[in-house]
Design a protein with these regions (language model features):
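Extended carbohydrate-recognition surfaces in non-catalytic/accessory domains of CAZymes
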Residues: 213-251
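Intrinsic-disorder/low-complexity regions
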Residues: 11, 65, 87, 111, ...
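Conserved beta-propeller blade repeats
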Residues: 113-114, 174-175
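Beta-rich carbohydrate-recognition and catalytic domains
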Residues: 1-45, 50-108, 116-169, 178-213
């Protein structure tokens, strides 16, 4: 598979209606850039741009993105989170201290950062997958920081874990908003049939959704069928066809 890059698209039309956006021909970030770092040499994944009006790192726009790479000392392959800075969202400069957040275990994913500021603390909601300390495959949790660079991992219970028939395989990829006093935690839910959808957890009971996955497709299961109803057979004289291989088989 070809590696993924980070691109840029824009629109001058209202966001409330579905329409095609204009896209830049070339990526704004690529693993082939001269300043690409070791932790992103394999491929780049999801990005999110945080508008830091205080310019904590010297620029108003901070892009958090996760990428795959091998550690130059341990050779561990993992997905880690790094940042890049911009003044116009068109040209980006990688932070020299990348990655800013990672879990060093082979095959582990630390990704899809979603940044919110609560008081004077920056909160990074993120998902982790294939973490050897967990029995489940993917889950949502968070880390906190005062400067967008140094992050302290939450050591308490994970926020969202696989626990329902719609997210029993993966419960990951956070997007968190607070509206009218209620915190809504949207996330991607994947069940054992690999059906994928958007689920939500709330800070207080808000009822149940009426949306459901389609009935699961049954695979690799032996089925017994009765063939004695509605079937007919004919006895054909194969000699009439000159050669038995030419005779039709009718059931």
């Amino acid at each position: 598979n070809k590696p993924l890059y980070i691109g840029l698209a824009w629109t001058d039309r209202p966001l409330g209606s579905a329409h095609e956006w204009q896209a830049q021909d070339q990526p704004v970030m690529s693993i082939h850039d001269k300043d690409a770092q070791w932790w992103e040499k394999l491929t780049q994944y999801k990005s999110v741009v945080y508008w830091d009006k205080e310019k904590t790192l010297g620029a108003p726009f901070v892009m958090f993105y996760n990428a795959a790479g091998r550690h130059p000392e341990t050779d561990l392959k993992a997905e880690r989170v790094g940042i890049a800075l911009s003044k116009d969202m068109k040209k980006w400069k990688r932070y020299p201290g990348n990655p800013v957040f990672a879990h060093e275990a082979d095959g582990t994913i630390t990704g899809d950062a979603h940044i919110q500021k609560i008081g004077d603390v920056y909160v990074m909601f993120y998902f982790s997958a294939f973490e050897p300390s967990r029995k489940y495959k993917a889950f949502n949790t968070f880390a906190a920081s005062y400067d967008l660079v140094h992050w302290t991992d939450w050591k308490g219970a994970d926020l969202i874990i696989p626990s329902k028939d719609y997210d029993e395989l993966f419960a990951h990829k956070s997007y968190v908003v607070k509206h009218n006093g209620v915190v809504y935690h949207f996330y991607c839910a994947v069940n054992d049939a690999e059906q994928r959808g958007i689920a939500i957890a709330t800070s207080k009971p808000m009822g149940r959704s009426q949306v459901h996955f389609p009935e699961r497709e049954v695979k690799n299961r032996r089925m017994v069928m009765e063939l004695d109803k509605g079937w007919k057979t004919w006895l054909c004289d194969k000699s009439a066809y000159g050669h038995t291989d030419n005779a039709p088989t009718v059931v």
